[in-house]
């Protein structure tokens, strides 16, 4: 399959009256950047972790390209250190007696690692519900409440697979369109296949929403296809959760009400003020350290202070079609509205032609192909009727 590049644009401006520490995975090739990292560390995941110090009004901005996501890599054996890393016990994805007992119950009579992982995949998809935002993050709370978002589905899948000795990692990234459109999923390592993709939360949404197939990509029409395959329209920021921060993150002694706490395993966690035993819960794409002890009374913290902002844009013919959709939608709706007020065969032709072009863009991009194929056929027939009247 031909690769289709995306442009990732990340931006962080320090608008606070203090210096900010920021950790961020740095791609090997950057298109442009405004600041160089003060330190650069190689992570066990193979990524480079950049450490930045941003003073008041400093801006970090960089762009880079990413190819169409695929987990298929050369089947390179994991080193002992890598295997241990992807089998580790963490706060968000624990490996303990409870997870081992559950994993064994799910996989009774199943011997191969691939089949065990697929049984776990099916179990989670069938027995848990998607909910955003989740009440609390982490496997402990997910097992209790039986619902959560993409991260919780991924944490539990990692936890159960690791409990059976299957190297697993939780990926954090973004859908390849729009702004701040985050997502999390998994990859498992199999000796004869290498790393393969698994998206439990998308499979769950596909299975439990009977009309979801109308919105599906052709490659993942059936929910079980999300074991070993994705639609590819996503980019990766970091290749596991709980990545140790270097240099070390010093937890704040007190917590500020300026930041609403995140719940992790039903315990308040203050993003940007503490770590999980020296690690960021996840890098999507950044983690910051903010000193809130000297905040003025009316100081408020927004998402842009905690994460920065990112957007992903497609290039090439897919990018052209994505942009065309916006303009075609405006033309189609505007001309349809005018035609409704003042009926005119030429306006009717224009809005129907615009809708035909718009629906064609969706089909060519393989976005909701069944739904828009139906719309396209209906609109083409209607357009032909209008043309016949004009003639």
Model-derived features: positions:
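Low-complexity, Gly/Ser/Thr/Pro-rich intrinsically disordered linker/tail segments
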Residues: 6-8, 21, 219-324
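Secondary-structure boundary elements
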Residues: 60, 64-148, 156-158, 240-243, ...
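Intrinsically disordered, low-complexity N-terminal segments that are enriched in acidic
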Residues: 1-70
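Juxtamembrane boundary at the C-terminal end of a transmembrane helix
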Residues: 383-391
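Canonical alpha-helical transmembrane segments of integral membrane proteins
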Residues: 325-340, 352-358, 379-382
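Hydrophobic/aromatic-rich core segments of domains that either
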Residues: 153-265
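A structural boundary/capping signal
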Residues: 159-163, 319, 336-339
